[in-house]
Amino acid sequence: QIVIIDNLNNSSKEVLSRIEEITGTTPPFVQADLRDTDTVHEVFEKYSVTSVMHFAGHKAVGESVENPSMYYANNIGSTLSLIEAMQAAEIFTLIFSSSATVYSSTALSPFKEETEKDPINPYGMTKYLIEQRLTDLIKTHADWRIGLLRYFNPLGAHPTGRLGETSIGTPNNLMPYLMQVASGKLPKLKIFGDDYDTPDGTCIRDYIHVADLAKGHLAALQFLKGRTGAHAWNLGTGKGTSVLELVETVEEVIGYPINREITSRREGDVIEAIADPSKAYAE
C-alpha cells in the first residue's frame, strides 16, 4: 500500500481521482507539511510505513536564485523533519529525489556519480546539503538504506494522458511552459540566452521521461533490499537536447510554430548537463 503526504503547495487533490482512473484504487492521502514532524510520524505509525520516497520540495533554479531563503527553509527543513519522524518510527529505507544540479558547472558532461560537486544555484545547493546530511546518517546508524537519485530533466506524462505536470500558477520548467504557450494559455516562450558555447547557442539538457523516472525509483527500492549504506545513481538518458531542439521537435509534432523570444541568460543555469547513466543500468 502507498500513502501520500503533500501540502498541496504546487499540486492538486485532483491527482487522486486520476490515479483511481488509471489503477482502480485511490491511495490514502494526508494533507500536511513535512515540517510538521508529529503529523508525519503519526502517518507512519497509522499506516505501518516501511520505506519512504521523498519528492517534496521547491524545484526551480531561477526561483531559487530570486528567493534562496525559501529554498533553504523548505527543502532542507522538511528533510530534517522527515528524518526525525522516520527515526522515531524506526523506518530506515529512504529514496531521495536529488538533482543533477549538485554537479560542478565546470565539470564536463556526461556526469558520473563521482563527478565533482559544486552547485552554482541555491536549489542545487539544497540538494547537495541534503545528500551530505543523509550520508552522515550512515555514520551514526548502520541500519539506514538510502538511495540518492540524481534527476536530470524529467518531462512527459502518463501514457493515458491523465497524469502529467500541472503547476499551480506559471510553470517554472521548460516543457510545461512550452505546452502552455502551444495551447494559448501563455503568450510567449522566453529562451534564456542563445550565446552559449553549444551548436545552436542554447543550453543542453538530458531529458528523461517521467515514466522511466518512476521505474528508476522502484528499481532503487528493490536494490536497497538487504543492503545498507547510501547509494547514488544518475537518472538520465545519456543524450543531450538543446532548448531550441526541444522547441523545434514540439513544433514538428503540433504542426505550427511556437511564439518565442530570445532573452538574456538566466543566473544559475549551466551550459550543459548530460548523464552517464551506466551505473543505474548496471545495478
Model-identified regions with their sequence ranges:
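Pocket-edge positions in alpha/beta enzyme catalytic cores
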Residues: 32, 44, 71, 166, ...
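Short-chain dehydrogenase/reductase
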Residues: 72, 120-128, 164-176, 206-207, ...
